[in-house]
Amino acid sequence: LSVVALVLVGRWLNATKVGGQQPTEPFRIAGNFYYVGTNDVAAFLITGPEGHVLLDGGYPSTALMFMASIAKLGFDTKDVKVLLNSEPHPDHGGGLAVLQRASGAQLWASEASADSLASGGDDPDIILPLRGLIWSGILGYPPARVDHRFKDGDTIRVGPIALTAHVTGGHTRGCTSWSFPVRDGDRLLNVVSACDLGVLATSTYPEQAADRERSIRVLRGLPADIWVTCHARWWGRYRKFVASTTAKNPVDPFIDPEGYRAYLDAAEAELRSGRTH
């Protein structure tokens, strides 16, 4: 376990210094739906006349990057009224407290993720060596104030914005995917933001494989014209963004139901093989 922990810490520190912390150009995906994350750690802004929703918090040190991206698009972080989260690991929950202080937004969390977010990343399902690193502050992050806890199937609203929560456990117990409509011109597009479907096997979460299988089934049942995930490389952020800069309609490269099905097929094949990532 100590070897695994060291490998994971190395990956985390590498992501912190390189992959997860490089700012990238923010852009509109479709309608009122924007990408404001880094080159790989994703964050999304959904804008509305009564306030905005920000999905995911990144690492503690990416929060300022997210806010800079929001400003570059012409919006104000102080107009973010709701913060949402996919899962409480440091690369997605670590910056929520910083964003919360900057915006004054209310944080909604799944019942199974709330305590971890409020504790700065502690989770009884994390293997003990990694929990020790969280307790020591090496892998921990500033605790977030959880204002509301939601259940599977709840809908979070800010004016005309409505996002439905789908608790898709496996990566963590409270891992949450989101579905919501986006109006782009005369098209009403279905968007799915899928939570991580990979697992880090742990003896304290014996339902992990069953939850992962259920999550894939749930996600297959969600119509997705546009799909994204909490890591940009999985849904082809860069490729789709580049294609959008020359497309007749810049939204078209992001419409990818075939890619969504392929992503779920790959996750199911990984599950059947017993592999994790």
What are these regions (language model features)?
Residues 17-22, 57-61, 119-129, 199-208:
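Acidic/histidine-rich helix-loop elements
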Residues 32, 46, 56, 66, ...:
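Divalent metal-coordination and catalytic microenvironments
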Residues 9, 61-64, 71-155:
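Active-site HxH/HxHxD metal-binding segment of metal-dependent hydrolases
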Residues 22-73, 77, 177-199:
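Conserved beta-strand hairpin/beta-sheet module of binuclear metal-dependent hydrolase folds
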Residues 2-4, 10, 253-277:
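C-terminal regulatory/interaction regions
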Residues 31-35, 58, 83-86, 203-208:
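Short, flexible loop segments at the rims of nucleotide/cofactor-binding pockets, characterized by
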Residues 52, 59-61, 141-148, 153-158, ...:
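Metallo-beta-lactamase
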Residues 2-25, 129-136:
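Short, basic/low-complexity N-terminal boundary segments at the transition from targeting/disordered tails
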